[in-house]
Amino acid sequence: MSQFDKLLQQIKNLDRNMRFDELRKVLEHYGYSMSGPASGSSHKTFRKPGKYPITIPQHEPIKRVYVEMVKEIVESEEENE
């Protein structure tokens, strides 16, 4: 099992110890690009054409609600493959 597959499994299990960089890696794999203000905010927005943007605070560990949001994206992307 590759490291990426392990990350996907952690997301599907709603792991409480997910880190921002791990979620970023998964979202970027599915074509989302990260943007944020030049300074002053810890929140980063991930965008993909034709999809709703998702905003995630860059704090660790990531709260469960944000992991759930990424889980929905992963499941949606897997259905479309």
Tell me the role of every PLM-derived stretch.
Residues 11-31:
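Polyanion-binding surface elements
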Residues 1-11:
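Solvent-exposed, charged helical/coil patches
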